[in-house]
Amino acid sequence: LEDQFYLGLYYSTLTSSPENYNQNKFSSTLNFGFIRDFPFNEQRNFGVGVGVGLSLSSSNSNLKLSDLNSSVSGEIVNSEDFTKNKWNTTKIEFPFEVRWRTSTPTNYKFWRVYFGVKTSYLLKSKYKYESLNSNYTLENLPFRKTQSGITVNAGNNTWNLGLYMGLNP
């Protein structure tokens, strides 16, 4: 196994969303960090990885957020009524993975499969709305501070395909 720096770009989508909710433009997550390997066998091809990283997410949709008496509410609006409607989050993340690969001490082109759990802590959140009639920004949105999800990564050589499914609504 090997320690690794990681860099990932994910397409973000909601699996449970309000009626008439639509994502528009490209909603994405960029994450990067470091994972330390702890091998379980002499071949060093099975073990666990523990790490720390940073996650930057941007979500574009027709869900308009408003601040009403220090309480944030949301409503579905027509996508043609605004020019910008997105929220951004910054999180510190802590991945834990069970790791298996076909590597040998001399072969660096190998298959890999990693299953794991990622826990993250929300550091910052920001919402921006722009239309012909209204422009405003909200910060420190009432999102859950601690979030967890299941991860699956599989790949060959230097490329991986990764999936993340959040466990918290």
Where are these regions (language model features)?
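Outer-membrane beta-barrel proteins
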Residues: 13-15, 35-41, 99-104, 158, ...
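Short loop/turn motifs that connect adjacent beta-strands in outer-membrane beta-barrel proteins
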Residues: 1-3, 39-46, 103-111
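Extracellular/periplasm-exposed beta-strand and loop segments of Gram-negative cell-envelope proteins
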Residues: 18-25, 59-69, 74-89, 122-132, ...
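Surface-exposed strand-loop-strand hairpins of Gram-negative outer-membrane beta-barrel proteins
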Residues: 12-33
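Structural signature of outer-membrane beta-barrel domains
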Residues: 12-14, 53-59, 118-124, 166-168
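Predominantly the C-terminal beta-signal and adjacent terminal strand-loop region
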Residues: 139-169
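Residues on the lipid-exposed face of transmembrane beta-strands in outer-membrane beta-barrel proteins
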Residues: 32-38, 52-54, 94-100, 115-119, ...
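N-terminal targeting leaders of membrane proteins
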Residues: 1-8, 12
